Amino acid sequence: RQSPASGGFGISSSALGGVAAGGLIGLLLGQKKVRKMAGGAIGYGGAAALGALAFRAYQNWQNGQQVGQATTATVADVPQEGSRFAPVNGADGRPFALALIQSMIAAAHADGHIGAEEQKQIFEAANRGGLDAEDKAFIFDALHNPLSPDQIAALAGNQEQATELYLAARVAIDPDQPDEKAFLQHLARWLNLADDLVSHLEAQVRQNL
């Protein structure tokens, strides 16, 4: 995981745009994680930035593009709310942005823990971000009881949501440790993602983040 100084879980006021849960995703992404995508994704909130990257990777995969020549996501790829890459709810009936947060937190736990300072930053952002008491409790539970890959996969109602849940986990960490790599591999299998689709998602991460 990246340190706050390098943009991993560090709080950035410019990353806290959009709806409350989407803004918390912006926090988890960190300023560096969202500002590079076409120069304007921050204004849409963190969930929309993830949706744009997932949409572009999915389209490139469906169109049979080679990973090395794949089209890079732009702000034009930010999905409309309620579309398949910006769903209102996940398979559990709760806001899909909360499922993305659960996936990100679970990935951050893959190396064994989230540090006390990181937890404090997330708590503070949730408290001032406009989340209601139920949603805050939901996020706090995710911090203390992170989901397993199969539990994350159960939150996906379709392949597009599965794609986005994987991407959320991937951008939350720099998978340079065996535990992190294993987590992503297990998650991809539970989400039933094709290997070449995963490669396209990785390409969007490299190109945009």
Which residue ranges define each predicted feature?
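Small-residue-enriched hydrophobic alpha-helices in membranes
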Residues: 1-102, 119-209
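Primarily EF-hand calcium-binding motifs
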Residues: 105-107
